[in-house]
Amino acid sequence: MTAYLTISEFEKFGYELKKPDNFDKLLKSATVLINQVCSYYDPAFAYHDLEADSQADPGSYSFRQAMAFKKAVALEMVFLEDSGYSSAYEVRQGALSSFTVGHTSMSLNGSAGQNLTVGGTGVVNSAYNLLGRYGLIFSGVASS
């Protein structure tokens, strides 16, 4: 499986990891979480080719979808690193006690991680909203 994002693409979006050595680990975790809400580029379903769409004409909708998807993965990686989470389970457990982005630091209560993410998915709101804006959210019916 080809990775959804390269280090150079991550940096091109303007993001930076505090521990660059964790890039691959964070990418794997972000991939699992993003695939829960967006199966559009998931190779298991083979609906669309992320590599082909990201090399399409920059004015095309396919290109914009691919860039939005990659940026959502990057946003999720930043959230995972900053929060210390690595799975939706950890978000649901409410293990987050502090969150720092740049020069802003917040101390949060036990359920704050759930407030920063969508439902029990572990996907940070900003990434989810970006995926939704480009029609990339999976909206199947859950079975109980």
Curated annotation (Swiss-Prot):
Full protein name: Uncharacterized protein ORF4
Organism listed in the record: Lactococcus phage mv4 (Lactococcus delbrueckii bacteriophage mv4)
Family: Belongs to the Lactobacillus delbrueckii bacteriophages ORF4 protein family.
